[in-house]
Amino acid sequence: MPKRKPVIAELPAPEEIDFGALAREYIDSLVDLIVVLGPTASGKTRYAVQLAGEINACAALGLFEGCPGRMTDPAPVNGAEIISADSRQVYKGMDIGTGKDLSEYGDIPYHLIDILPAGAQYNVFRFQQDFRRVWADIRSRGMVPILCGGTGMYINAVTAGYDFTSKVSLSAGRGPSEAEGLPRHPYFIGTLVSREVRNERIDRRLDARLKEGMVEEIRGLLDSGAPAETLISYGLEYKYVTLYLQGQLSYEDMREKLATAIHQFAKRQMTWFRGMERSGVRIHWVEV
């Protein structure tokens, strides 16, 4: 008989994450990657930073030393670091438009942010390669890797074992050579917010970013040689502000169309994550 897909409620129910149990699962190698995902304006970065801070605090107090587990060779826990899964935060100089507030990370180390100049080409295949290297390095130092972002395809590429040579996913029965360098036991946490609250946050955040100089940031990228067509291809803020700077939209039209586009984008992100659940991925949703 074909495998029955799980029944997914229209809205996920929030949970309370048992941090101690999650830590024990990591030490026992039942978890080898924590994933914090969610739509834009859902508070996922803040949650990931808070989680990493809790892990760091416990490690500093030595609470993980001698932690009882089932494994004879438990995974060490010296702290936590964050790997970004955002397709646009990889670019230098694209800060306000991508919500790249590096001060939010505090003293938590982060990776795969500001690794390329704006206008450069980057894709899911390169992300998977970069993730392999960073994930292995973090774990080799006894740190807990936390993947945080809203780019669903990037998240799937490293947690479902996408094989870009054959264009198929290796999530089912992948062998050691196929999955080499990728996590086998990810633990998914989703940041949950209602559509109404999310859209209100998006609108407030957009107005704040416009006041903070988002238009000037994108004008500077164009002046520095970033091709307009490339910025437009990045979508959302970079698309509509570039069109405004080219004289194709009024300021009012730019703001209105951009807000609508971000609302729709957040909805598509949530649809992607619910689709992951329908395919069998267990996401633990939390209210932030």
Model-derived features with residue positions:
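N-terminal phosphate/diphosphate-binding loop that engages ATP/GTP or pyrophosphate donors
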Residues: E10-I34, T45-I146, Y154-V168
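Short, surface-exposed helix-loop/turn micro-motifs enriched in polar/charged residues
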Residues: N123, M143-L147, T230-S233, M254
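Gly/Ser/Thr-rich helix-start
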Residues: P39, T98-K100, G150-M153, Y162, ...
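Phosphate/Mg2+-binding loops and adjacent switch elements
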Residues: D137-D203, D207-K211
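Noncatalytic linker/hinge segments flanking ATPase motor cores
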Residues: Q121-F131, G152-A157, A228-G235, A261, ...
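Conserved, function-defining core regions and hallmark residues within catalytic/recognition domains
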Residues: D86, G150, Q269
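Short, conserved catalytic or adaptor-binding loops enriched in Gly and charged residues
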Residues: L102-D107, E178-L182, M276-R278
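Catalytic core of IPPT-family isopentenyl/dimethylallyl transferases
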Residues: M1-P76, R184-V288
